[in-house]
């Protein structure tokens, strides 16, 4: 009797555990993919000009370390303001603090001027932002994914 109970309990626990491994349904979710980079935008033209100045071939990529939080914020703010076609923004931690709300305002302004905005956030860093993110996701030019 005890063995039968333990077997049934193990099977039930296994079924529950395996059920938790299933992915959510993609039904109703819109398909989305990145827009290919183009040199026709103001940022693309600037990048092409800088590449020519550096005499760097097209296959070379680079990064520019931003040493201070102020520099990093200013760079993000500037790039969002200059966007004309699309923005793909990915963050591990996004807080509803002053800088986070200012950047969300910049993203909303970009969407209002016709820029497609895709925001990918780690859900662990968005505590208390569900309502705000849901509202942003209702904008026709904004996709929020957690």
Residue ranges and their predicted role:
Residues 1-146:
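N-terminal localization/anchoring segments of enzymes in phospholipid and broader phosphate metabolism
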């Amino acid at each position: 009797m005890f063995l039968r109970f333990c077997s049934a309990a193990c099977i039930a626990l296994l079924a529950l555990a395996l059920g938790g491994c299933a992915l959510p349904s993609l039904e109703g979710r819109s398909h989305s993919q990145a827009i290919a980079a183009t040199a026709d935008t103001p940022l693309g033209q600037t990048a092409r000009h800088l590449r020519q100045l550096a005499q760097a071939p097209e296959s070379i990529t680079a990064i520019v370390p931003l040493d201070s939080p102020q520099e990093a914020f200013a760079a993000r703010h500037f790039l969002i303001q200059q966007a004309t076609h699309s923005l793909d923004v990915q963050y591990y931690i996004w807080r509803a603090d002053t800088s986070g709300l200012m950047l969300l305002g910049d993203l909303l302004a970009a969407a209002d001027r016709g820029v497609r905005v895709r925001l990918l956030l780690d859900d662990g860093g968005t505590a208390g932002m569900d309502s705000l993110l849901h509202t942003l996701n209702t904008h026709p030019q904004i996709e929020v994914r957690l």
